[in-house]
């Protein structure tokens, strides 16, 4: 059944894979036995098992027998050359002789499947057709018809599919595509129309770039219509079958060929393909334009005037990237404006729950921002990528806040955050964001200067052979930090290195003069520095103290500073000897180039710059953990038409003796003469063939009672079914399955499976206590040692996660208990075999197998449940997420039980429309090979600490590739046993599920509540401008919604309670079918729902006049439609002014 593919791994890991494969075989055999009984659309399990990429490609697109050859070619040549070679061999007829067009189509699909690891649906759904067409001169050329789902392949694979097309064209001896001027201009028009009417591309090409590309690409990039928008200029062209937008073709042209031009050129050079040199000219023209625009290096620029200042002190100007904040959604807060002081401090490193696009934040902050950040919440970020997922890391710098009584404190624990959250006046610093080197490498974003942190400090001490205490690095005392710096001549400890760079030189002198008026005293047995807070000048100085992030208390108009030792020494005052170390402050001030230079002239030791880069972020999607339901939710894929009413209840239809016409495959049983919708007659048990297809009266009553009789059930309660099948053959699912799902309170998806969706979060190491599993159970599952090689005996030991093990949300575990009970009922009552799961509580699920799957793919990945978490996320190894072709930037995927998929999935249920085969397990991977997963994970770093060279090099803002020589990533481990084990991380976290579990966005009710809370958060964050937030919410969310709803109201369809829908109101004003009154599909409330909120927001935050005027115009438009002025009788004299 399964060929065990050799992967480089240890004996322990090999045993783990073998156990998974054995369990898959066992479950497969159970499903095979059940399917042979004939109650399902086919007698076989419809999910082929694949041990590797080659198997997946053959299972997904074929041709038969290609897997072995793919393995040989990939081993010999590598993935990309192998894809081209396999395409050539298909064209040559080595895998079957069929007509020319079919060969070309098979070659392109198979090559694209190899390029996308046989995971995504693009080779099946993204290529609608491949044709051989004629040029005006009579020569033949190749045309690839792309469809919308080609998006799932990603830009690089889209571009390479065009390269494959060219390769196939040459192999078949075809000429190149010769476009007419009208066809060229049609592409220009379509790109512009798509951007104005449908959506934006990742790249915005010029008209000349499009013209150059179309003239030079050797095949025709065309496609089927994907949008209802029609071109107005270049219509009815002989070789273009539609006047509508060809979205798939445009994606391939813009986000494939033009955006990924550098990658195409690399492959062209590597593979020796001719005819693509025009891309070099296109790129050089683009580079020239960029040089003309500005002399900046990408977004980053070093201020040349400051070059003369020593590297650690200089000001580095990094241009803010404002793209992430171009639109703000109502109710979802902005946490920091682009690069604004007080935002997230960039810190390099990886915790056991970060990496692969997920970033770490201090859990205390999550409570301080009113729980709008929870575990798994998506953030749209300024850099290095476009988005990330929030996870807690409590070993990084916490937020610093100012309380309403004037105190400034570091909120370094969740308990402290909960205590002060209602007393916070201002969040001065949001704390660190932990970003791993791999994310910069993946996004090819220049490395930005590292913050001054404990890891860098420790590396300096090690490099200089200076002895130190580990506790001193983590938690130094103020006096100890000063003494250590003076004695060892090293920079001051990061803990007491304040944000001097965020205030001016004059501010520093003002602060110094004020502090020196104070005195040393004791408070509650501790030495403190006390300064008066009386006059306006004192208040200005206190504000500077706040801005540099120095903690202090305010009592009786006095400022009390506990960590005064490093503060005063940094300002040139010897606390120990009560002596001012500065003789001529005016001269020093004059000679200082900037604030950091001034501090270093004042202090008796080196003071490093605390922060070079502040990162902006806003909330994206909230985290998700919920059962997958169709709209509306149904229990089974059994069609009942409109017989069950709006709620689609078959039991109600049976009770009321209702029926309706449905399109189905059926036959008349030769034995009992009754109509059978199944391959086994439900009334007499005779095996039949469904040889008829058409519209019949649904025999609901007969089927209902036959199903109840077979299951031995009297009254199952409400059972929700579908109105009609969307599949091609309209083969129905047995009604018994719907009844059993309803009894167990579970729902069905379009393909017959029962799924649970949750946000993807990576984890490489865990503690047994975090995932609610006993040490004994973990030892049974093969976890017997911790990361230090010690025997696993305690729930707090850190253990490395195996690549196919998953930790599901608690709510998922509870749902899967119901699903397992449904499967067992199905086995026992429907298939008449033994129960399998025998699950009573969620702990019983541990050790069972699931399938993990992403919506844009057609290949599932086998996983094993090893625990559950209270967080609303699905934890899995980064490899597991990558095997689904996902990263972890806030996306969600689904889990479903393996036996559920084997028993209930059928291709016969899949919708007969473009994209219908996406999100369906058309093939299943049993063994995870890191070489065959999404390449993004290969950039994730695997080190236990970053070297000193890395931190030093970041100051030069190099390309991440320039430091690769002293960094280790997953790529360096591929093909070795270490690819699975011994992966390191740099920062610890107490628990992977610290912080709020549910984002406030989901708990708040009305939009008014959400926007009020959103702006309340903005008000208290120093790095956020609440007026700008209000303006952006109104402009990018409310105004487009109001206009769109107004337009929708004027174009709306109407419906009737009988289920009929009409594009326009019928002339008689009532439903022609039943005579009932018609109902609007867009109500007045839907049109004006945001109007009041927008007006209140505009008034309260005094947004600009332009926005206020736009709102006024929209309101007038709404009133003109919905005004209902009572008519009144008027006399002629009313129109005259009577004196």
UniProtKB/Swiss-Prot annotation:
EC number, UniProt record: 2.7.7.7, 3.1.11.1
GO molecular function: DNA binding; DNA-directed DNA polymerase activity; single-stranded DNA 3'-5' DNA exonuclease activity
Single GO BP term: DNA catabolic process
Pfam families noted in UniProt: PolC_DP2_cat (PF24846), PolC_DP2_central (PF24844), PolC_DP2_N (PF03833)
Domain of life from the UniProt record: Archaea
Keywords carried by this UniProt record: DNA replication, DNA-binding, DNA-directed DNA polymerase, Exonuclease, Hydrolase, Multifunctional enzyme, Nuclease, Nucleotidyltransferase, Transferase
Stored InterPro entries: PolC_DP2 (IPR004475), PolC_DP2_cat_dom (IPR056172), PolC_DP2_central_dom (IPR056171), PolC_DP2_N (IPR016033)
Catalytic activity line of the entry: DNA(n) + a 2'-deoxyribonucleoside 5'-triphosphate = DNA(n+1) + diphosphate; Exonucleolytic cleavage in the 3'- to 5'-direction to yield nucleoside 5'-phosphates
Family: Belongs to the archaeal DNA polymerase II family.
Self-association and partners: Heterodimer of a large subunit and a small subunit.
Described function: Possesses two activities: a DNA synthesis (polymerase) and an exonucleolytic activity that degrades single-stranded DNA in the 3'- to 5'-direction. Has a template-primer preference which is characteristic of a replicative DNA polymerase.
Protein name, per record: DNA polymerase II large subunit
Organism: Methanocaldococcus jannaschii (strain ATCC 43067 / DSM 2661 / JAL-1 / JCM 10045 / NBRC 100440) (Methanococcus jannaschii)
Gene: polC
């Amino acid at each position: 059944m399964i060929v065990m593919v050799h992967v480089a791994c240890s004996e322990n890991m090999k045993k783990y894979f073998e156990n998974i494969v054995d369990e898959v075989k066992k479950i497969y055999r159970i499903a095979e036995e059940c399917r042979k009984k004939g109650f399902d659309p086919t007698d076989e399990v419809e999910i082929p098992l694949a041990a590797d990429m080659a198997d997946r490609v053959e299972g997904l697109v074929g041709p038969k027998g290609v897997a072995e050859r793919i393995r040989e070619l990939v081993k010999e040549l590598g993935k990309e050359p192998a894809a081209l070679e396999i395409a050539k061999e298909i064209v040559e007829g080595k895998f079957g002789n069929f007509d020319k067009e079919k060969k070309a189509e098979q070659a392109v699909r198979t090559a694209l499947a190899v390029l996308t690891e046989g995971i995504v649906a693009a080779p099946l759904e993204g290529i609608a057709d491949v044709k051989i067409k004629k040029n005006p001169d009579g020569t033949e050329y190749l045309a690839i018809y792309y469809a919308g789902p080609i998006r799932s392949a990603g830009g690089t694979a889209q571009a390479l599919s065009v390269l494959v097309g060219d390769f196939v064209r040459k192999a078949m001896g075809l000429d190149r595509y010769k476009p007419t001027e009208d066809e060229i201009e049609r592409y220009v028009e379509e790109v512009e129309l798509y951007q104005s009417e449908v959506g934006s591309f990742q790249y915005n090409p010029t008209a000349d770039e499009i013209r150059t590309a179309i003239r030079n690409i050797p095949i025709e990039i065309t496609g089927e219509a994907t949008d209802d928008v029609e071109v107005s200029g270049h219509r009815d062209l002989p070789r273009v079958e539609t006047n509508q937008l060809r979205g798939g073709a445009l994606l391939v042209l813009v986000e494939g060929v033009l955006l990924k031009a550098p990658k195409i050129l690399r492959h062209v050079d590597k593979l020796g393909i001719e005819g693509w040199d025009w891309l070099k000219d296109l790129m050089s023209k683009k580079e020239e334009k960029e040089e003309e625009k500005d002399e900046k290096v990408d977004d980053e620029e070093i201020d040349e005037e400051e070059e003369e200042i020593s590297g650690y002190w200089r000001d580095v100007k990094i241009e803010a990237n404002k793209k992430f904040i171009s639109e703000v959604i109502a109710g979802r807060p902005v946490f920091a404006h682009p690069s604004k002081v007080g935002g997230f401090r960039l810190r390099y490193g990886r915790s056991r729950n970060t990496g692969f696009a997920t970033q770490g934040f201090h859990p205390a902050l999550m409570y301080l921002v009113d729980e709008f950040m929870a575990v798994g919440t998506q953030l749209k970020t300024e850099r290095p990528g476009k988005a990330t997922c929030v996870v807690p890391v409590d070993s990084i710098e916490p937020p610093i806040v100012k309380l309403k009584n004037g105190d400034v404190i570091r909120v370094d624990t969740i308990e402290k955050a909960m205590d002060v959250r209602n007393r916070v006046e201002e969040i001065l610093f949001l704390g660190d964001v932990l970003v791993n080197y791999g994310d910069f490498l993946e996004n090819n974003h220049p490395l930005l200067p590292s913050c001054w942190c404990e890891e860098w400090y420790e590396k300096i001490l090690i490099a200089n052979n200076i002895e130190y205490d580990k506790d001193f690095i983590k938690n130094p005392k103020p006096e100890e930090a000063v003494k250590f710096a003076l004695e060892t001549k090293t920079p001051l400890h990061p803990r007491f290195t304040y944000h001097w760079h965020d205030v001016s030189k004059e501010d520093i002198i003002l602060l110094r003069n004020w502090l020196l008026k104070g005195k040393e005293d004791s408070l509650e047995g501790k030495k403190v520095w006390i300064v008066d807070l009386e006059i306006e000048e004192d208040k200005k100085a206190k504000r500077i103290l706040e801005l540099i992030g120095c903690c202090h208390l305010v009592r009786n108009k006095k400022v009390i500073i506990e960590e005064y030792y490093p503060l005063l020494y940094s300002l040139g005052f010897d606390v120990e000897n009560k002596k001012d170390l500065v003789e001529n402050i005016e001269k020093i001030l004059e000679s200082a180039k900037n604030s950091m230079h001034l501090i270093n002239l004042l202090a008796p030791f080196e003071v490093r710059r605390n922060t070079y880069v502040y990162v902006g972020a806003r909330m994206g999607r909230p985290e998700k953990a919920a059962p997958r339901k169709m709209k509306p939710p149904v229990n089974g894929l059994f069609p009942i038409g409109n017989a069950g009413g709006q709620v689609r209840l078959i039991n109600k239809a049976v009770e009321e003796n209702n029926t309706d016409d449905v399109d189905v495959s059926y036959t008349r049983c030769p034995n009992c003469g009754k109509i059978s919708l199944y391959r086994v007659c439900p009334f007499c048990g005779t095996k039949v063939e469904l040889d008829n297809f058409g519209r019949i009266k649904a025999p609901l009553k007969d089927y209902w009672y036959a199903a109840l009789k077979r299951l031995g059930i009297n009254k199952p309660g409400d059972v929700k079914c579908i109105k009609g099948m969307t599949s091609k053959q309209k083969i129905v699912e047995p009604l018994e399955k719907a009844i059993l799902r309803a009894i167990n309170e579970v729902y069905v998806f379009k393909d017959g499976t029962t799924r649970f969706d949750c946000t993807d979060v990576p984890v490489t190491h865990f503690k047994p206590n975090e995932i609610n599993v006993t040490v004994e159970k973990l030892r049974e599952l093969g976890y017997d040692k911790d990361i230090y090689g010690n025997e696993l005996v305690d729930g707090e030991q850190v253990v490395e996660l195996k690549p196919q093990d998953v930790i599901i949300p608690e709510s998922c575990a509870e749902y899967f208990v119901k699903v397992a009970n449904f499967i067992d009922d199905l086995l026992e009552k429907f298939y008449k075999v033994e129960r399998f799961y025998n699950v009573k509580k969620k702990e019983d699920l541990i050790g069972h197998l699931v399938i993990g799957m992403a919506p844009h793919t057609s290949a599932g990945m086998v996983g094993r449940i090893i625990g559950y978490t209270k967080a609303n996320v699905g934890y899995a190894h980064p490899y597991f997420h990558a095997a689904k072709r996902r990263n972890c930037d806030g996306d969600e995927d689904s889990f479903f039980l393996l036996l559920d998929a084997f028993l209930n999935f059928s291709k016969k249920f899949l919708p007969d429309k473009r994209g219908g085969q996406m999100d369906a397990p058309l093939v299943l991977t049993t063994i995870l090979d890191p070489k065959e997963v999404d390449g993004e994970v290969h950039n994730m770093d695997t080190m236990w600490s970053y070297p000193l060279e890395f931190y030093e090099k970041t100051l030069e803002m190099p390309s991440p590739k320039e430091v690769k020589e002293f960094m280790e990533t997953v790529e360096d481990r591929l093909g070795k046993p270490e690819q699975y084990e011994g992966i390191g991380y740099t920062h610890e976290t107490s628990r992977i599920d610290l912080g709020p579990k549910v984002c406030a966005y989901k708990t708040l009710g009305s939009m008014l509540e959400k926007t009020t809370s959103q702006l309340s958060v903005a008000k208290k964050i120093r790095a956020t401008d609440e007026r700008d937030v209000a303006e952006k919410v109104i402009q990018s969310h409310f105004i487009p919604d109001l206009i769109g709803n107004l337009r929708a109201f004027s174009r709306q369809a109407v419906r009737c309670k009988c289920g009929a829908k009409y594009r326009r109101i019928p002339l008689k004003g009532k439903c022609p079918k039943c005579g009932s009154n018609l109902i609007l599909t867009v109500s007045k409330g839907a049109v004006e729902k945001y109007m009041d909120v927008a007006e209140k927001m505009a008034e309260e935050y005094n947004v600009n006049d332009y926005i206020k005027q736009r709102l006024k115009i929209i309101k007038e438009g709404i009133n003109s439609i919905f005004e209902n002025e009572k008519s009144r009788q008027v006399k002629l004299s009313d129109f005259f002014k009577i004196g």
